[in-house]
Amino acid sequence: MEKYLINPNQRIATISKDIYGHFSEHLGRCIYDGIFVGKDSKIPNVNGMRTDVVTALKDMGIPVLRWPGGCFADEYHWTDGIGELKDRKKMINTHWGGVVEDNSFGTHEYFELIRQLGCDAYVNGNVGSGSVREMNEWVEYMTFDGVSPMADLRKKNGADKPWKLRYFSVGNESWGCGGHMNGDYYADEFRRYNTYVRDYTAGEHIYRVACGPNAFDFKWTEQVMRKVPGQADGLSLHYYTVPYNWDHKGSATEFNLKDYDRTVAKAYRMEELVRRHTEIMNALDPQKRVDLIVDEWGTWFDVEPGTNPGFLYQLNTMRDAMVAALTLNIFNKHADRVQMANIAQTVNVLQAVILTEGDKMVLTPTYHVFKMYKDHQQNTLIGSYLTNSNTVECEECSAPQMIESASVDENGTIYATVTNISATKKAKIKCQIADTKVSTLRAEILTGDMHDKNDFSNPDAVQVRPFDGVRKLSDGFVAELPPCSVVKFVINEK
């Protein structure tokens, strides 16, 4: 039996709600069909936004939504997406499927979506093919509440008042699709562009994100972090869980135990990535002025047969749920540096939380993990430690069988989320909570065979259910977690 220790007296950091953020790019059917169907659609909508999707995302507790990319961001010119629909310029989405982008979803539509969701805005600016002036004028258009050419243009297009822009990223993947730059060059470009990302509203600082590394590119982090503290508020990190390699990633649904173990073990490398990049940031920014922003993460498998390869459509199983659960626990544990994270992507793309097909909608296992974990948002991370006698391994790496995190809310309620990522082994734990006499304990579980999924023929196969494999103790609990499971424990003291 493994020992699980929780110490509510050890208050570490606030778990930012934005760790549970999402990302929607102009890619495949994420925006179009997935979220935006237009006002004239027969699918129920409010101002073009699918009512079912908006409701589901609100129920899940979506705190922030990144847009318009991704690689798309560095070929997106915002003025093409404003004004009358009939006058908007069409373009070819060269990164994603070579389809025509009609720009019917632009800045105004994005902020209407943000309004309906009740979440914060995270806009990604164009450094790769844009200009300083273009970026400056976009920020002015979105946020200035005075008399100026851009503010007047916004009013002409129907928005009398500016919007609140919480986050703004200066470029995306500038080491790759955003310009193939090196770290030193990008850092100088960031400083130049960032100068003109102005705070137009008193008391409303726009949080600036600098382009950070791709996965294990520690040199990039060092180069950029030598130049951006005092200028940037955050540094991005991108890491995708690819079971094999980019030419042969593996199927999203047809996989064996070896494939499963490789996936969850490689997902756990996020712990190493966050730790090592944070070490560099701590050395160059000991005041912690710059946060870590993991604004692209998740599983990336081969696309579903018969779909456009550029649309990145993949189904979602309990394996994906395990990746989501263990990763969110890692982010929670590093809440002192990780301010925001954005899973890729919200609807119909990669590790989506929602799938749509016509007027039908499916909530994926990943969706249910996010909804389970939403109680952690804005809680205080507390000290916790779980022993692990077993590991899940692949040739390159390994992961502990269980990954956990614990938090406490302002009322003293403790939330502990524990993931058993083994597909074959159950796990017994005995939890002791320091200086706590347990009054009530409730728990819920998401579990199933590693292949279990929700699809349009069986949308409710994977569901969160009450967990009866737990027994309350005076100072904690004893529980037995089945294979491939995530459990949330909610503890109140006397």
Language-model segments: residues:
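Non-catalytic accessory regions flanking glycosidase/transglycosidase catalytic cores in CAZymes
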Residues: 1-234, 270-303, 307-494
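Histidine-centered catalytic micro-motifs
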Residues: 237
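Active-site His/acidic residue clusters
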Residues: 240-261, 307
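Beta-strand-rich domain onsets/edges
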Residues: 265-266
